[in-house]
Every structure is written in C-alpha cells, then in structure tokens.
Amino acid sequence: MRGCDSLLGIVRSILLCLHGDEPIAEGPIMADILFLEYPKCSTCKKARAWLEGKGIAFRTRHIVEDNPTAEELAAWHTASGLPVRRFFNTSGMLYRELDVKAKLDAGMTDAEAYELLATNGMLVKRPLLIIDGKPITPGFKEAAWSAALNL
C-alpha cells in the first residue's frame, strides 16, 4: 500500500505542475475520457468494469477497428513522458511476428514507432485511458488510474 501512496503523491505533484496554483479538485474529475479497448481482451474487460463500477463516464473506441493514428500516438507519447516502447503490446503475437523488439533495440525512431503502431491496433498496449487528450500509463494500472481520476 505504501507504493500506492507514493504513486498518488507523484501524480498529484505532476497535476500541480500542469495546473500551476489552481487547486486540484477532490473527488472524481469531470473530463473528456476516452477508453481505447479491444473488447475480447480480459484486461480491457477488467478495466471497463472498474471504470463502470466507479461511475466514471467515458467514450469507448475499438483499438483495432479504429486504431490510433500516428499523430494521436505522437501526441499521447509526448504527453506521457514514457519511452515509446511502453506503447507497444509486447505480449502480442503481431509484436513477435514483426520482431518489433529488435527494431526498437536497433534504434527505431519515435516517428517510425508511431507509424508502425498506427498500422494495426493489435500492436498498441491496451487498454489506454486518455483524459482530456493526455494518456494514463498504457495498460490497466488501478493505482495510476485512481490517482489520475482523483478517486
């Protein structure tokens, strides 16, 4: 539990930096929330149930039928501050078939990564929660999602 408290403190610090002296509202945030999912994915099902259980209103987007564009991925990656490889579904068959790890290790640029990710939603780590255009850690991390949503 101590790690969760620490993570919550970090997220609150980031929010303070983003919002300056504006107070951070307590309780669930009211925002434009986009939930990118692959409906057959068990982690996506768990994340969806968690959001619904918390009473969070969100829009959904099928990550394969309407996969993210290179431009969206670039914006989300930049806003996240995470390494681009965190946006790849490293456990997926397509990731292994295309030997993406070797390409990343060989120095694939961020722009090349965005283009590759945009070719097929199955390459993208899911679920992906986007709040007001800014992503939360790719994949379902309850502590990070709770902190970002002020829960």
Which residues does each PLM region occupy?
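Short, Lys/Arg-enriched N-terminal segments with co-localized hydrophobic residues
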Residues: 12-29
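Thiol/selenol-based redox catalytic cores and closely related redox-interacting motifs
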Residues: 65-151
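Local sequence-structure signature of Cys/Sec-based thiol-disulfide redox active-site neighborhoods
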Residues: 31-49, 61
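Class I S-adenosyl-L-methionine
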Residues: 45-48, 52, 96, 146
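Secreted/luminal cysteine- and crosslink-motif detector
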Residues: 5, 18, 42-45
